[in-house]
From Swiss-Prot:
It comes from Saccharomyces cerevisiae (strain ATCC 204508 / S288c) (Baker's yeast). Belongs to the mitochondrial carrier (TC 2.A.29) family. Keywords: Amino-acid transport, Calcium, Membrane, Mitochondrion, Mitochondrion inner membrane, Repeat, Transmembrane, Transmembrane helix, Transport. The lineage of its organism: Eukaryota, Fungi, Dikarya, Ascomycota, Saccharomycotina. GO terms for biological process: aspartate transmembrane transport; biosynthetic process; L-glutamate transmembrane transport; malate-aspartate shuttle. Solcar repeats lie at residues 528-614, 622-710, 725-813. It is found in: Mitochondrion inner membrane. This is Mitochondrial aspartate-glutamate transporter AGC1. Its main location: mitochondrion. It comes from the Eukaryota. The keyword Cytoplasm does not apply. One of its GO terms (cellular component) is mitochondrion. GO terms for molecular function: antiporter activity; L-aspartate transmembrane transporter activity; L-glutamate transmembrane transporter activity; uniporter activity.
C-alpha cells in the first residue's frame, strides 16, 4: 500500500482528480482547536465563495483545498467530466441513487469535519486498493460512532485513576487494514450503538407507507442475532465477520419474511396468503432495485403463463420466494452463460442471435463441469419464472419499439447521447481506413444504445426450436410466455446482468479514447511503423545474404561464362574458386552486397506488408490476386537499390576471370566501379532486373503465405488454428516458396547478369534485352537461359527462408505496439473472471485497436464510480433505507455524532 505522501504516478493522478473537483476552504469553515484537544467543527456553508464583484473573496480563503459533500458526490457520479467521452454511467440498469455515496463521505471524513482534506482523499484511495474495500468502508461508517462514544467516555473519566485508558486507546486508533494478520473477527462494533445508528437512519427517513406497514428492519426482533453476539467488558459486540455472514444469509430471509408477512392478504379463492402484482413489484423495488435490472419490474407478468399456479392478483409465498431465489442467483446464472459462451467459442454475433430453449438451458445446467463445481439446482417453477421474465422483457421492448412510446420510459430517454451521435456522424464518416472496421463495430453497438436497448435481436443463424422432452414434461400445452423459441443469449444477459448495457458503453468509451489517440498521431504512425519494419528487414536481409553469399558467387560465375571452357558445373566452379582464390574468394564483393541488401530487403518486406494491409478486405481476408499485386509491388520497389547493388557485386565477383586479359579491371574496387559507371551506368539492365524481381516476388510472397497456412495450419484470423509458427517451420516455408520463384525467373537473371558485365575479348556485346535473347539462342542454346539455375535455387531459396524467418522472429522479439496486438490475433472470446476488476483485451484479427471485454470494468480508467456503487450496494443490502441517504440524512448523522462528544 502506498503512503499518503508518495509521489508515485498513481498519487499524482489522484491529486489531479482531487484538484479538479475541490473547493477552497474558508476561515469560517476551518475547524477550531480548543484546550482539551477536541475540535469544534462548523458546517461548510459554501465551497465557492465570491466577493460582491463576483470574483473570489481572497480574504476569506485559507488556500487549503477540500471536497465538500456536494463536491464528493459530483466527483463520484460525474465521471463524464474527466474520464468518459460518452456517458455519465446512466446506462447502469440497476438503480443506485448518487446520494448514497454520501455514506462513503461520512465514513472517510476523519474527525467529522464536514469536508474531506487531501489526506482523507488519499486514505479513501488506499482503502479502495483492498479486496474487501466495500466491507471496510461499511465498518468505518459504524465504527465512527463507537470511537466517538469512547472519546466521550475518556473525556468524562479523564481524571479518574481507575479508568483503563489502554482499552479505549486501542479502539480509537486507526486500523491498518493491510496487516495480513488482521481478521474480520477482530473488528468489533458495539451492538447497542449499531442498533441506535440503524434507528437513527429510520428516524431520518420520511416514508409513511414503510412505517405504517412496519416494513422497517428492527434488529431487536431478529431471533438469529443472539447467535452472533460476543461480549467484551460486559457489553455486547458484533464482529465484522458476523455482520458479513448476516448480510449474506439471515438478513435476506428476514427481508422476504417481513415483506410478505406485512403485506400479504388472504386469497378467498386460493384459500392462502398471497400478494398482488403491485405489492410484489413494490417489495422487489424496495429490497432489490440496486441489484437487478430495472427492466425486470415491468416484466413480472404472471397472467400470460399457465405453467405457474399464480396470477397477477394472487402470488403465493412459494412463488414469491422463487423470484427472490432467482434474484439472489442472477450472478451465478450470468456466469453459467459466460461459461457456455466460452466453451463454445461464441462471438458477439452469436450472442445476439443464438437461441436458448429450455432444453438448451437444462443441458447447460446439467453439464458435468457444472455438477463438479456444485452448481446449485433450479426447480421447474424457477426456470419457468426466469423464461417468463426474459420473454416478457423482450415482448415489452418489441412493443415499445413498435409504438415509439418513450415518454413513459425514462431510462430509454436517457440512453440517447448526443456525443455518441456526433462521433458516429463525424469521426466515423471521416475516420482513417485503418480504424474503419473498429468504427463499424462501434456503430453496431451505437444503434442498440440509441434505441434504449430496444433492439429485438433477429434470429438469423438458429432455426425455430422444436418442442423437446423437457417442454413436453414440464410444459404441457404451448405457453406463450415461457415456451418462446426466439430468446437469445443476449436477451438473458440483459436481465441477468444489470450492467449489461453500461458495459457496452464503457467499451465504447475506451474505443473512442484509443481512436482519438490514433487520429492525433496518425500522420506520424506510418513513418514510425515503416521505420520499424525497415530496420528489422535490413537486419534480416543482411543475415540471409551472408548465409548464402558463396552460392550466389558461384551462380554469378556460371551465368557470366558463355561456354563450358572454364567451369563445367557448379561443383567444378566451387572447387576451382577455392583452389585458386581460397575460401576468402567466395566472399568477394560481400561488403557492397551487405550495404545494398539492407535497404533492398527492407524495402521489399516493408512494401509487401504495407500493400497486404491496404488490400485486406473488411473481414480481414486477402485473396490471391491482391497477394500477387502486393508481392509484385514489393519487387518493383526494391529495384531502385537492387540494380546498382547487383552490377557492382557481379563485377566484383567475376573480376578474377579478367586477370589474364585486363589487370586494371581485375583489381578494381567497388568505389572505382561506381565512379567508372556513373549514375546512368549503375542502372544498366534495369529492365531485365524488373523482369526478374517483379515476377519473383509475385510468386514468392503468396506461395510463402499459403505454405504457412496450408502446410503448417497457420491462420491468425481463425481461433481454431495456430497463430504462431516455430523457427524451423518458417525456414521451411520460406525455402520451399523460394524454389519455384527462383527457378522460373532464372532466364531474366541470366540476361541481367550478361547485360551488367563487360564482355571478354571475342565475345559479343549485348545492346539490350531482346538482342541478348537472340544472341544467346544463336551462339549458345535455350539451356543457357537456365545456367546457374540450380545454384540460384540453392541461393534464393534458403536466403529468403533465413530472411523471412529472421524478420518474423525479430518482429516477435522486438514487437512494435501494433505488432503486440497482432501477436494475439483471432483471440476474440468472452472469459469468466473471478475478479471483476481484471481486464481481458480483445483484439481484432487485422491488428486493430484493442477492445475491453464486455462484462468487467477496466483498471486503466478510474473506477471510483464502479467501486462506489459496490460500496453503496453493501449499505443498501444492510438496510434498504440507505438508498434514501441524502444531504439532510447526512446532516442528522453528523449532528448526532457531534452530540455524542458534547
Amino acid at each position: 500500500m502506498e503512503q499518503i505522501n508518495s509521489n508515485s504516478r498513481k498519487k499524482k493522478q489522484q491529486l489531479e482528480v482531487f484538484k479538479y473537483f475541490a473547493s477552497v476552504l474558508t476561515k469560517e469553515d476551518k475547524p477550531i482547536s480548543i484546550s482539551n484537544g477536541m475540535l469544534d467543527m462548523p458546517t461548510v456553508n459554501s465551497s465557492k465563495l465570491t466577493a460582491g464583484n463576483g470574483k473570489p473573496d481572497t480574504e476569506k480563503l485559507t488556500g487549503e483545498l477540500i471536497l465538500t459533500y456536494d463536491d464528493f458526490i459530483e466527483l463520484i457520479s460525474s465521471s463524464k467530466t474527466i474520464y468518459s467521452k460518452f456517458t455519465d454511467h446512466s446506462f447502469n440498469l440497476n438503480q443506485i441513487p448518487k446520494n448514497v455515496f454520501g455514506c462513503i463521505f461520512f465514513a472517510i471524513d476523519e474527525q467529522n469535519k464536514g469536508y474531506l482534506t487531501l489526506n482523507d482523499w488519499f486514505y479513501f484511495n488506499n482503502l479502495l486498493e483492498y479486496d474487501n474495500y466495500h466491507l471496510i468502508i461499511l465498518y468505518e461508517f459504524f465504527r465512527k460512532f463507537d470511537v466517538e462514544n469512547l472519546k466521550a467516555k475518556q473525556k468524562k473519566e479523564l481524571g479518574s485513576s481507575s479508568f483503563n485508558l489502554k482499552a479505549a486507546d486501542d479502539r480509537i486508533k486507526s486500523i491498518n487494514y493491510g496487516n495480513r494478520f488482521l481478521s474480520f473477527d477482530d473488528l468489533l462494533l458495539n451492538l447497542n450503538q449499531f442498533k441506535d445508528t440503524i434507528r437513527l437512519l429510520h428516524e431520518s427517513i420520511d416514508d409513511n407507507f414503510v412505517k405504517d406497514n412496519k416494513l422497517l428492519l428492527d434488529w431487536n426482533d431478529f431471533r438469529f442475532l443472539k447467535f452472533y453476539k460476543c461480549y467484551h467488558e460486559n457489553e455486547e459486540y458484533l464482529s465484522l465477520n458476523s455482520l458479513v455472514t448476516i448480510l449474506q444469509n439471515d438478513l435476506k430471509n428476514e427481508k422476504i419474511f417481513i415483506g410478505f408477512d406485512r403485506l400479504a392478504q388472504m386469497d378467498s379463492q386460493g384459500h392462502r396468503l398471497a400478494l398482488s402484482k403491485n405489492q410484489l413489484t413494490y417489495l422487489l423495488r424496495l429490497f432489490y432495485s440496486h441489484r437487478v435490472s430495472a427492466d425486470i419490474f415491468s416484466s413480472l407478468n404472471l397472467s400470460n403463463t399457465e405453467l405457474l399456479k399464480a396470477d397477477n392478483n394472487s402470488i403465493p409465498y412459494n412463488v414469491f420466494k422463487d423470484i427472490f431465489y432467482l434474484f439472489q442467483n442472477f450472478d451465478l446464472l450470468n456466469q453459467i452463460f459466460h461459461k457456455y459462451v466460452t466453451e463454445n467459442n461464441l462471438n458477439e454475433q452469436d450472442i445476439r442471435e443464438q437461441i436458448v430453449t429450455k432444453n438448451d438451458f437444462m443441458t447447460v445446467l446439467n453439464a458435468q463441469y457444472n455438477k463438479v463445481n456444485n452448481i446449485i439446482e433450479f426447480s421447474p417453477s424457477q426456470i419457468n419464472l426466469l423464461f417468463s421474465i426474459v420473454a416478457n422483457s423482450k415482448e415489452n421492448r418489441r412493443l415499445r419499439k413498435r409504438n415509439q412510446d418513450r415518454d413513459d420510459e425514462l431510462l430509454n430517454d436517457h440512453h440517447y447521447d448526443s456525443d455518441i451521435d456526433f462521433f458516429i456522424h463525424n469521426e466515423y464518416l471521416h475516420g482513417v481506413s485503418r480504424s474503419r472496421k473498429n468504427l463499424e463495430s462501434f456503430n453496431d453497438y451505437y444503434h442498440d444504445l440509441s434505441d434504449g436497448f430496444d433492439q429485438d435481436s433477429g434470429v438469423k443463424k438458429a432455426s425455430k426450436a422444436s418442442t423437446g422432452l423437457f417442454e413436453s414434461v414440464f410444459g404441457g400445452k404451448k405457453d406463450k410466455a415461457t415456451m418462446r423459441s426466439d430468446l437469445t443469449i443476449e436477451d438473458f444477459m440483459k436481465i441477468l446482468n444489470p450492467n449489461y448495457l453500461n458495459d457496452l458503453v464503457h467499451q465504447m468509451e475506451l474505443q473512442k479514447n484509443q481512436n482519438e489517440s490514433l487520429y492525433i498521431n496518425y500522420y506520424f504512425y506510418p513513418i514510425f511503423d515503416s521505420l520499424y519494419n525497415f530496420s528489422l528487414g535490413s537486419i534480416a536481409g543482411c543475415i540471409g545474404a551472408t548465409v548464402v553469399y558463396p552460392i550466389d558467387f558461384i551462380k554469378t560465375r556460371m551465368q557470366a561464362q558463355r561456354s563450358l571452357a572454364q567451369y563445367k558445373n557448379s561443383i567444378d566452379c566451387l572447387l576451382k574458386i577455392i583452389s585458386r582464390e581460397g575460401i576468402k574468394g567466395l566472399y568477394s564483393g560481400l561488403g557492397p552486397q551487405l550495404i545494398g541488401v539492407a535497404p533492398e530487403k527492407a524495402i521489399k518486406l516493408t512494401v509487401n506488408d504495407f500493400m497486404r494491409n491496404r488490400l485486406t478486405d473488411k473481414n480481414g481476408k486477402l485473396s490471391l490476386f491482391p497477394e500477387i499485386i502486393s508481392g509484385a509491388s514489393a519487387g518493383a520497389c526494391q529495384v531502385i537499390f537492387t540494380n546498382p547493388l547487383e552490377i557492382v557485386k557481379i563485377r566484383l565477383q567475376v573480376q578474377s576471370d579478367y586477370v589474364g586479359e585486363n589487370i586494371q579491371q581485375a583489381n578494381e574496387t567497388a568505389t572505382q566501379i561506381v565512379k567508372k559507371l556513373g549514375l546512368r551506368g549503375l542502372y544498366n539492365g534495369v529492365a531485365a532486373c524488373l523482369m526478374r524481381d517483379v515476377p519473383f516476388s509475385a510468386i514468392y510472397f503468396p506461395t510463402y503465405a499459403h505454405l504457412k497456412k496450408d502446410l503448417f495450419d497457420f491462420d491468425p484470423n481463425d481461433k481454431t488454428k495456430r497463430n504462431r509458427l516455430k523457427t524451423w517451420e518458417l525456414l521451411t516455408a520460406g525455402a520451399i516458396a523460394g524454389m519455384p520463384a527462383a527457378f522460373l525467373t532464372t532466364p531474366f537473371d541470366v540476361i541481367k547478369t550478361r547485360l551488367q558485365i563487360d564482355p571478354r575479348k571475342g565475345e559479343t556485346k549485348y545492346n539490350g534485352i531482346f538482342h541478348a535473347i537472340r544472341t544467346i539462342l544463336k551462339e549458345e542454346s535455350f539451356r543457357s537461359f537456365f545456367k546457374g539455375g540450380g545454384a540460384r535455387v540453392l541461393r534464393s531459396s534458403p536466403q529468403f527462408g533465413f530472411t523471412l524467418a529472421a524478420y518474423e522472429l525479430f518482429k516477435g522479439f522486438i514487437p512494435s505496439p501494433d505488432n503486440k496486438l497482432k501477436s494475439r490475433e483471432g483471440r476474440k472470446r468472452f472469459c469468466i473472471d473471478d475478479d471483476a476488476g481484471n481486464e481481458e483485451t480483445v483484439v481484432h484479427s487485422n491488428g486493430e485497436l484493442p477492445q475491453q471485454k464486455f462484462y468487467s470494468d477496466d483498471r486503466k480508467h478510474a473506477n471510483y464510480y464502479y467501486k462506489s456503487c459496490q460500496i453503496a450496494k453493501t449499505f443498501i443490502d444492510l438496510d434498504n433505507n440507505f438508498s434514501r441517504f441524502d444531504s439532510s440524512v447526512y446532516k442528522n448523522f453528523q449532528e448526532h455524532l457531534r452530540s455524542i462528544n458534547g
